[in-house]
Amino acid sequence: MNNGKVRIYELSKELNLDNKELLAICDQLNIAVKSHSSTISESEAESIRAAAEKLAATNGTSKKELNTTSHKPNSAPAGSRNRPAPPQKQQQILEIRKPKILRNTTSNAPEASVANNQIASSEANSPAPPRPFATPVSPMKPTAPSRPVPRNLSETPQKPAAPEAEPEAQSQAPAKIAVEKPEKSAQPRPGKPERQPKPQLVAPPSRPTAEKLDLSEITGAPGEKPILKRDRPRREDERDQAKPRVAKPAQGETSSAPVQKQARPAQGPVKPEQRVNRPGAPSGDGIRPQRPVRPSVDAAPVATPPRGVPGGRGEVGDTAAIAPDLLDLKRPTPPRLAKGGKKWQEEEIIDEIKEKAGKAGVKGKRVKPLVEDDFEDEDLLDEEGLEIPATVQVSLSIARPPKPKAARAATAATAAPISSPTTRGKRSSHNNRDQNRRQETEVKRERPEKVAVTGPMTVQELADLLAVADTEIVKILFMKGMAVSITQNLDIPTITLVGKELEIEVETAEPEAEARKVTEMIEVGDLEHLLRRPPVVTIMGHVDHGKTTLLDSIRKTKVAAGEAGGITQHIGAYHVDIVHDGKEQQIVFLDTPGHEAFTAMRARGARVTDIAVLVVAADDGVRPQTVEAISHAQAAGVPIVVAINKIDKEGAQPDRVKQELTQYGLTPEEWGGETIMVPVSAIKGENLDTLLEMILLVAEVGELSANPDRNARGTVIEAHLDKAKGAVATLLIQNGTLHVGDILLAGSAFGKVRAMVDDRGRRVDIAGPSFAVEVLGLSDVPAAGDEFEVFDNEKEARALASDRADKQRLSRLLQGRVTLTTLSAQAQEGELKELNLILKGDVQGSVEAIVGSLKQIPQNEVQIRMLLTAAGEITETDIDLAAASGAVIIGFNTTFASGARQAADEAGVDVREYNIIYKLIEDIQGALEGLLEPELVEEPLGQTEVRAVFPVGRGAVAGCYVQSGKLVRNCKVRVRRAGKVIYEGVLDSLKRMKDDAREVNAGYECGIGVDKFHDWAEGDIIESYQMVTKRRTLALTR
């Protein structure tokens, strides 16, 4: 207690109370505490002490009452409910204590006489309560079903009940005796009585088999009751210990009532009675001493015979004489309650169950409050006592009109199942929650035995693939001498090494070609309606080899000069009309960029194409993107026509180009191969007609066809967000026909076609197979490469669009997730430098290409965080996001929306605009390098030779000659003798003649002094250098 503060657990020690009891008192006094380690003020502690004293006083009296009363819940509740007769309770308690004295005596006759006297007094004091007690016992039977094992016990008691027809006086006497004995025996050795009663219960069921069936049907699962009996003795002894447990007491309470019932049947067979009586001193007689001792179950059997007469088990229909017997039997139980706090709760629950038997509606309500008040045992006892008398009254009223045996059995059976779930459910609800939590934590992915890797992966991605913690991988590599961070890329050999350490086989799988055709656009139903369609031709090749020039040359030759506007430059898809064999035919061209960043766009072009035209410059030959284009076309399985461009240049060598192409499986026809190669000049227009004829020839061989009489299907070639038009997508129809007004779904973008524009800027209402059109009306910008489809049902299309959008959102969240391990790793390494970027481009393909290039920049120490990548204008929303996150906005071939530039100036947001991807990548790489910590580099200054040594005081000075460079005072020096370094330090003193010098250049002599080194020798070489900071660079990973 420091500074007037007291902790709950200290107060509990002081008051000799359990923490839970003290917390319950705090809750009653409205004192806010969270746990036993919470602190409270001294004033609050005083109020708790006062409440605890009152509670102790009430508990003491209640315990005495319980000891005296034969049945814990019945006696206490009866007195509490029948407030006018509280003195009766005291008298009954005194009588119960007397039976304890009788326990010592083993003779049945004296016990019977004492019991009769006590019964008479108790009946005179409170005749009504006995009947209610009997009825509560019957409800207890229904509750017993919670424990299945005791079923046999319950059944056996029922059989004995029928044969047992003894005088009421006899039953009463044994009841008292049994009650008294169990009290004594249970107190000295609670564990033994529990164990012994269990076997006893099992034995009786075997004797009464026929009646057992009936009883089981009636009670449902009365067998549990015997188990409850055994528990009661335990609980009496454990009362103080078990107080915190609420669920168990509930079960014990329900079980106590069934135990008494079992005692009733056991009365017939003397042996079962003796077994059960172990806890409660049963006499050898067949009398029902077990029934009186609820724990022992001896007294209950005595009362059962009369009950059986009026109402099957005598639960409801008991005679007035039987009621007193029951009272006597119940009286023995209260002592047990006094012993165990849990038993009080159990008996209270039993009383509630009895009430439930009387009225089914009350059952659930009773149990719930008990569970809520788990920690307030004594309060519960008082409250339960009050409620129990009410139950007794109800049972008495019901008992007056005895019900038929069958009806009683049915009610008991129904009551039992209902009550048992309540007690069971209360106890199991917490367990279920714990089990669920355990299952959630235990749900771990099993470590795979084999994984396939297609390329480098980050530590985090590898950890997810191998189902291990990323810190485990960092630890493994650290033990191998490699210090890596969570976000560092690991190459395949390193991944294999990690897999070997974890005993996981790592296979290197070939990455799936992006250009491979995934979806077959023509379905089985289209086969009977196929018609010839124009070929789709993709022009591919290296940068600056003349692809776009070649396409422009073809169009200028074949397109009327006055056509409006020509092409919308973003589309990259155009159609050309030519005359071949006297027929007018069309060819659709797709133009792809040649820069290395546009790999995905080239792959997309190859995937949707029918023929690939490979443009190679005659003066440059095969280049990296040429090789990539060949691999895309081969992966897509499309024929290749080679156009050798720039043959008009002086350095053109078409044959050398053909020779280089043979290394990649492209052998010209004139050399015996199958590849068509046409030398052309895009600028002069040479051999363009030959090239077009060859394209049509290859198309005829391929027999290209589609079904125009169906809903359109195809691929999104390009997409962007237009300021005036909204989402604009360039679609290539590969099968079917697209009409204005069609319901279109492209990826997760849903919409209705509002307008279509062809490559020449004309609005069209219909677009057939192989045509490329710009479509307006989509709700969102689809991703380039997505497949689109037309639906007849708008509802179906919307549902599918919503599902796809949800999946995309989930994948984005998973990619952007930050784990605790990554955060801790960043903390250990110091703050991880990040460059936040917002990227806006003119079209989706450009954005995709830029993101792909940025991913190639190594990000071990600095990282690029793409907050937003989208096609469209730079808007005020982008400016707000950048201002909030400290991001830089990158615009590629795009513009500002109205007000965005002003907002950027006001917010101080850095906006960079580019139209060349090379420059953009270089600037971002430079910004990342600027975030890197500069490294210290050794910069040599000069070399000096020692030619003389002059002793000065205790040290020495070297007379030196500067051979090269210069010497600077306070620079770092390294002294070498015979090629070995003998000293490294700082040059402390530098003199020229007798004056201090700041530096001495080559060709001059000087004196050198070093405070910590005096062992100079002629011929030593002094190397001077200084440490300078150098900007670090990042190399792009290829």
UniProtKB/Swiss-Prot annotation:
Region (G2) location: 566-570
Spell out the Pfam families in the cross-references: EF-G_D2 (PF22042), GTP_EFTU (PF00009), IF-2 (PF11987), IF2_N (PF04760)
Top-level taxon: Bacteria
Function as written in the Swiss-Prot or TrEMBL entry = One of the essential components for the initiation of protein synthesis. Protects formylmethionyl-tRNA from spontaneous hydrolysis and promotes its binding to the 30S ribosomal subunits. Also involved in the hydrolysis of GTP during the formation of the 70S ribosomal complex.
Q: Which residues bind GTP?
A: 541-548, 591-595, 645-648
Q: State the residue spans of region: G1.
A: 541-548
Q: Where is this region: Disordered?
A: 39-346, 403-451
Its family remark reads: Belongs to the TRAFAC class translation factor GTPase superfamily. Classic translation factor GTPase family. IF-2 subfamily.
User: What is the protein name given in its UniProt record?
Assistant: Translation initiation factor IF-2
InterPro entries in alphabetical order: EF-G-like_DII, IF2_II, IF2_N, P-loop_NTPase, Small_GTP-bd, T_Tr_GTP-bd_dom, TF_IF2_bacterial-like, TIF_IF2
Q: What are the record keywords, sorted?
A: Cytoplasm, GTP-binding, Initiation factor, Nucleotide-binding, Protein biosynthesis
* Primary localization: cytoplasm
Q: Which GO terms describe its molecular function?
A: GTP binding; GTPase activity; translation initiation factor activity
Q: Where is this region: G5?
A: 681-683
Polar residues: compositionally biased ranges? 103-125
Q: Which residues form a coiled coil?
A: none
Residue stretches of biased makeup (Low complexity): 157-176, 407-423
List S-S links within the chain.
none
